[in-house]
From Swiss-Prot:
Molecular function in Gene Ontology: ATP binding; CMP kinase activity; dCMP kinase activity
Keywords: ATP-binding, Cytoplasm, Kinase, Nucleotide-binding, Transferase
Name of the protein in its database record: Cytidylate kinase
InterPro entries, per database record: Cytidylate_kin (IPR003136), Cytidylate_kinase_dom (IPR011994), P-loop_NTPase (IPR027417)
Species annotation: Mannheimia succiniciproducens (strain KCTC 0769BP / MBEL55E)
EC number: 2.7.4.25
C-alpha cells in the first residue's frame, strides 16, 4: 500500500463532491477534509469570540490555532471544533456571510493552507474543495475534478430544498449558482480549475453510484490500497 495517499476532489458548488468524498472515505477507510467547511468554522470561531472581521492579522492568528475534525458518521459528516459538533452552526446564513469575508484575506488563506496540509496522514486522505489539487495538495497521487451543468446542479439543489420542506425558486437558485461559478473561476487567488493531471468526471447524466464507481476504478488504477 502506498503511504500517505491523498485523493483530491475539486469542483463547483452542487456537483456532488460532498457525497462522493463521504463515500470514498467510508469505502477506503480514509480521513476526510472538507475545505469549504474549514472557512465556515473559522468564521464561526471569529463570531463566537467577537473578533474583528476586518482585522486580517487577528483572523489569521485565530485560523492558525483551530482544532478541527471531520467525522463521517451515519451517512453524513460531523464537523467538530474543539471537540464540539458545530455541523449545524456553520450552516447559518450569518456564518456563510462571515466566511465570505474571512476567505478574502491572504494571511487567513495562508494559515488555513497549512492547517489543511496537516490533515494528510498515513491513514490516507480524501480532500474535498475547489483548489485541493491545484494549491493545497499539488503532489496528490490521485486528483479528481467533479463537474455538472449549472442547470443540473440547480435542479439538485431545488430538489434538496423541496425534500426538506423548504420553498425555493429554481430561477433564483440557477442564477446564484452561475454567479458563484463566475466568482470562483475568476478570483485572483486560487481560481476554480481542474489540475492538469486530474480526471474530469461530469456527473450531469450520471447517478451517484456511477460517479463513485468511476472514481474508485480510477483510484485503483493510480495507487495500491
Amino acid at each position: 500500500m502506498t503511504k500517505n495517499i491523498v485523493i483530491t476532489v475539486d469542483g463547483p458548488s452542487g456537483a456532488g463532491k460532498g457525497t462522493l468524498c463521504y463515500a470514498l472515505a467510508n469505502r477506503l477507510g480514509f480521513a476526510l477534509l472538507d475545505s469549504g467547511a474549514i472557512y465556515r468554522v473559522t468564521a464561526l470561531a471569529a463570531l463566537q469570540c467577537k473578533a474583528d472581521l476586518t482585522n486580517e492579522a487577528e483572523l489569521a492568528e485565530l485560523a492558525a490555532h483551530l482544532d478541527i475534525e471531520f467525522l463521517p458518521e451515519a451517512g453524513e459528516v460531523k464537523v467538530m471544533l474543539g471537540g464540539e459538533d458545530v455541523s449545524g452552526l456553520i450552516r447559518t446564513q450569518e456564518v456563510a456571510d462571515a466566511a465570505s469575508k474571512v476567505a478574502v484575506f491572504p494571511q487567513v488563506r495562508s494559515a488555513l493552507l497549512q492547517l489543511q496540509k496537516d490533515f494528510a496522514t498515513p491513514k490516507g486522505l480524501i480532500a474535498d474543495g475547489r483548489d485541493m489539487g491545484t494549491v493545497v495538495f499539488p503532489t496528490a497521487q490521485v486528483k479528481l475534478f467533479l463537474d455538472a451543468s449549472a442547470e443540473e446542479r440547480a435542479k439538485r439543489r431545488f430538489k434538496q430544498l423541496q425534500n426538506k420542506g423548504i420553498s425555493g425558486n429554481f430561477d433564483q437558485i440557477l442564477a446564484e449558482i452561475k454567479d458563484r461559478d463566475f466568482r470562483d473561476r475568476n478570483r485572483p487567488v486560487a481560481p476554480l480549475k481542474p489540475a492538469d493531471d486530474a480526471l474530469l468526471l461530469d456527473s450531469t447524466t450520471l447517478s451517484i453510484e456511477e460517479v463513485i464507481a468511476q472514481a474508485l476504478s480510477y483510484i485503483h488504477q493510480k495507487v495500491k490500497i
